[in-house]
Amino acid sequence: MKSSFRFANVCGTVYQQGNIQFAGDGDMLYSPVGNRLSVFDLVRNTSFTLPFETRKPIARVAVSPANTSLVLVADEDGHAILINVSRRALLAHMNFKLPVRDAQFSPNGQYLAVTHGAQVQVWRTPSVLVREFAPFVLHRTYVGHFDDVLSITWSRTGRFFLTTSKDMSGRLFSLDPVPGFRPKTFSGHRDSVVRAFFSLVEYTIYTVSRDAACLGGQ
């Protein structure tokens, strides 16, 4: 007698840590459950857990805006896997060698920005259509902070991105060199800056610190 059992879901395990991510129009939710990733369909009221696992509990989840089936999950030590959720396929392994505090795909999905201690690394994302020998290729490393980087926020065009750090500052970087542009620092906080945001027209930048202070700059 032959049987064809396959992994479908995790029962009895609860959320421990890591960020949750909405995908598409908000009808899908990705949530870390230990060292696995669960997917919730909020419209059909169903869920399943992917049959892939990281070495340690998941600390960060990133979803590509250009293809919401493309998801990166990184564990506490910086070991990451890239998954195609719709096909339930494991695309690549990556060791970032340091804990990943934030990871964000660019708006077009072609780049992945990852915190790396006091630096930010931007990687070219692999194609989901072809199998590549080196799926992740380092584009550039960005420096300027003096302590761990905590968050990354891309501009709508993907030409610039914001970072925040424990050094109580935020910085604006360009993805590629722009004539006449130098990375700009946003200071004035008295505690770690946990997040930064672009205004609607991206003329103003807001930084928020752990002590609930919000500052704006242009």
Where are these regions (language model features)?
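WD40/WD-repeat beta-propeller blade N-cap
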Residues: 11-15, 52-58, 94-100, 142-149, ...
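N-terminal cofactor/phosphate-binding cores enriched in small/glycine residues
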Residues: 32-49, 55-60, 78
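Core solenoid repeat modules with strong leucine/isoleucine-rich periodicity
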Residues: 107, 116, 124, 144, ...
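Per-blade loop-tip surfaces of WD-repeat and WD-like beta-propellers in eukaryotic adaptors/scaffolds
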Residues: 2-4, 39-48, 82-92, 117-139, ...
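Loop/turn segments within WD40 beta-propeller blades
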Residues: 20-26, 62-68, 103-109, 146, ...
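Conserved strand-to-loop turn within each blade of WD40 beta-propeller repeats
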Residues: 33, 74-77, 115-118, 164-168, ...
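Intrinsically disordered, low-complexity acidic/Ser/Thr/Pro-rich linker and tail segments
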Residues: 1-43, 121
